[in-house]
């Protein structure tokens, strides 16, 4: 091989590496978007499951309707209301998400944290408790 052919071959390889690097960047961006969407959908599913279980528990039976008319709350409904009032659960969920490597701040909520780096916005939110 002469020097020109070698130079052309190296230039061609450099172009291919550049294209592969661009494709890798695109894949990384798509993966980040999919992780954000997956996290958002998981949160939504969990919220909907809780809401469904609360509505199933709170569905009044004939006896419960009579109790509700007289101002006495049915035991299941009372428990459901207590669960809704419980504030620590939401905080615990945010802490768990942060530990799993996702932002919980209003600036970058749901997006993955790069290399598990700490986010000052997230930390200030979690330390407000």
UniProtKB/Swiss-Prot annotation:
Family (UniProt): Belongs to the YabA family.
Cofactor binding mode and count: Binds 1 zinc ion per subunit.
HAMAP family referenced in this protein's UniProt entry, alphabetically: YabA (MF_01159)
Pfam families: YabA (PF06156)
Record flagged with keyword Disulfide bond: no
Ribonucleoprotein listed as a keyword: no
Species: Listeria monocytogenes serotype 4b (strain CLIP80459)
Keywords per UniProt: Cytoplasm, DNA replication, DNA replication inhibitor, Metal-binding, Zinc
Known cofactor(s): Zn(2+)
Protein name, per record: Replication initiation control protein YabA
GO BP annotation list: DNA replication
Location in or out of the cell: Cytoplasm, Nucleoid
Subunit organization: Homotetramer. Interacts with both DnaA and DnaN, acting as a bridge between these two proteins.
Function comment: Involved in control of chromosome replication initiation. Inhibits the cooperative binding of DnaA to the oriC region, thus negatively regulating initiation of chromosome replication. Inhibits the ability of DnaA-ATP to form a helix on DNA; does not disassemble preformed DnaA-DNA helices. Decreases the residence time of DnaA on the chromosome at its binding sites (oriC, replication forks and promoter-binding sites). Tethers DnaA to the replication machinery via the DNA polymerase beta sliding clamp subunit (dnaN).
Cellular component GO terms, alphabetical: nucleoid
Stored InterPro entries: YabA
Domain of life: Bacteria
